[in-house]
Amino acid sequence: MKKINRNKPVPWTVLSLALAATILMLGLQPRTSLAEDLVVYKSPTCGCCKKWVKHMRDNGFNVVVHEQYNVTPKKDEYGVPRRLRSCHTAKIGGYVVEGHVPADVVKQLLEEKPAIAGLAVPGMPMGSPGMEGFRKDPYDVISFTSTGKTGIHASR
């Protein structure tokens, strides 16, 4: 009968502990990307749109960009009310995201799943993601339904 040396750990025990520690650490790490793509339609010449895309990527979104000079047909297709339109249009999780909507508001939208068509930040307010500069203007994130009903979803 072979004698076990208590001073030398059994390889399977060490391997099991290492595997358990790895699984635990992976489970505790924050998500770095969301499962579904954020599909963005924007003009290839728009600098603030590029900055908004970077903001979304920096906040864990996997962004797929479609560059086209005329984004209006996508806005029409997705039912974005004319008074809420901005420079770029995106879609994720069945929702429309119009303009410079902050990443945390989009994450909240995807978690809460309200009965709306999407969110919009009309125009291009200074201080919104992608429009950072020397000043920060207050702005609202507007929710809208497929029938055109709107409401203030968040204020910044």
Task: Report each predicted region and the residues it spans.
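Local sequence-structure signature of Cys/Sec-based thiol-disulfide redox active-site neighborhoods
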Residues: 34-53, 57-59
